[in-house]
Amino acid sequence: PQMMGIPLILIAIILPMLLMFTSSTRLSSNRMTTMQLWVMNTITKQLFLPVNMPGHKWAAMLITLMIFLLSMNMLGLLPYTFTPTTQLSMNMALAAPLWLATVLTGLRNQPTASLGHLLPEGTPTPLIPLLIIIETVSLFIRPLALGVRLTANLTAGHLLIQLISTAAFVLMPTMPMAALSTLIVLMLLTGLEIAVAMIQAYVFTLLLTLYL
């Protein structure tokens, strides 16, 4: 069996080694460890500004998630490759457990405040049942919104690239100048897709931090 072309037996051999061997604080850090710590600190400062200090324990996992999403998004821009994050099933598999973890953590640590979000302060008494239903639905729709947003943005960009590249290929024999203009548009759109891949990975992770 394979996962994205990588044999699972290879992953099973390498992963325990990565978990077992950690850098010691008594030894001087190498360049790789220093770079990893710098990346973690930089991203943590950006992502966790609205989060209190106890929430910073999520930093390593969410940064790993963002790097994973960025890698998967960029993978689809290579020729003859498939973008895993254009599949709603994969995005939901990432969004739903993490969203559920934030909800359960909030209910465990601050149950009153978590349940208080279902009823905004100052709500008129007749509207209380309706607002509780609306806030509950909006709470449960969050993972779906995360997954659909990522899927829709990446799929739309890839479809545009496919259509414009097909148009350039068709116009090349008969209308070379029009094909050249189409290729220029294709290059600009590819640059835009690179930016979208980065932004979507950041937004996915940022929204999860806001749910904390």
Swiss-Prot record:
GO molecular function: proton channel activity; proton-transporting ATP synthase activity, rotational mechanism
Gene3D superfamilies according to UniProt: ATP synthase, F0 complex, subunit A
Keyword Transmembrane attributed: yes
Annotated transmembrane regions: 3-23, 58-78, 87-107, 128-148, 154-174, 179-199
Cellular compartments annotated: Mitochondrion inner membrane
Primary residence: mitochondrion
Keywords: ATP synthesis, CF(0), Hydrogen ion transport, Ion transport, Membrane, Mitochondrion, Mitochondrion inner membrane, Transmembrane, Transmembrane helix, Transport
Superkingdom: Eukaryota
Assembly and oligomerization: Component of the ATP synthase complex composed at least of ATP5F1A/subunit alpha, ATP5F1B/subunit beta, ATP5MC1/subunit c (homooctomer), MT-ATP6/subunit a, MT-ATP8/subunit 8, ATP5ME/subunit e, ATP5MF/subunit f, ATP5MG/subunit g, ATP5MK/subunit k, ATP5MJ/subunit j, ATP5F1C/subunit gamma, ATP5F1D/subunit delta, ATP5F1E/subunit epsilon, ATP5PF/subunit F6, ATP5PB/subunit b, ATP5PD/subunit d, ATP5PO/subunit OSCP.
Family, per entry: Belongs to the ATPase A chain family.
Protein name: ATP synthase F(0) complex subunit a
Naturally occurring in which organism (per UniProt): Tropidurus montanus (Lizard)
Origin organism lineage: Eukaryota, Metazoa, Chordata, Craniata, Vertebrata
